[in-house]
Amino acid sequence: MTSVAGDTAIRLADAVVALGGFPALAGASMSVERGELVALRGANGTGKSTLLRLCAGLVPLARGGATVLGVDLADDRVAVRQLVGLLGHRNGLNAELTCRENVAFTAQLVGASPNDVDDALQRLGIDARVAVTRAGALSAGQRRRTALASLIVRRAQLWLLDEPHAGLDTAARNELDVILRDATRSGATVLYTTHEVDRAGLATPRTVTLSGGCVTSDVSSKFGVAQ
């Protein structure tokens, strides 16, 4: 399924998600335009991961409104799952397969070609040596790049990344920032979670803060304006 035309990738209006009777999101409202790079900041337990899972169509909306890439989540969560890519802490890789085999497996599922796999690896700066290395033997940064290459071959329009900088050294974190900016220049929208104040403010044009399941601030570091 293709997405409906429009400039807004994510629109939440007083969105409530209840997990086990507990309001993991308690009336969150925000919007993300297509092509934006946005950091979602907050302490553990504030609803960051739940918001990503909501936008990925993995958890139901209890109340409020939520539209992702032109699709109303109340109507068709399955359609949304075909349009977005959610990357969690474990990267979703098979440790016994090589880097390239992991990406090729995703390509096979979505009907992408071997050339698409090669192009994705090249975009992520994955060289021939890394490509034939088992995922279990890769560094944290290399595993993250492999997982992101899978999002590219899926042609995911919206990248939802849960703590993508976690476990990376400074050099790998800075390289990841460049990759995410390049992804938006290529047409993707990127929303990632972090609990690091400095990383959100310095590396990303816009930072949305969650507390208690609600959006408490929305700041553009590029223009220095709080919304």
What positions do the PLM features span?
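The feature captures the beta-strand-to-loop junction immediately N-terminal to the Walker
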Residues: 41-43
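Helix-to-loop junction immediately C-terminal to a conserved catalytic motif
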Residues: 56
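Conserved ABC transporter NBD signature motif
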Residues: 64-75, 80
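Conserved ABC ATPase "signature" region
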Residues: 104, 114-130
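ABC ATPase C-loop
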Residues: 151-152
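Catalytic Walker B motif of ABC-type/P-loop ATPase nucleotide-binding domains
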Residues: 159-163
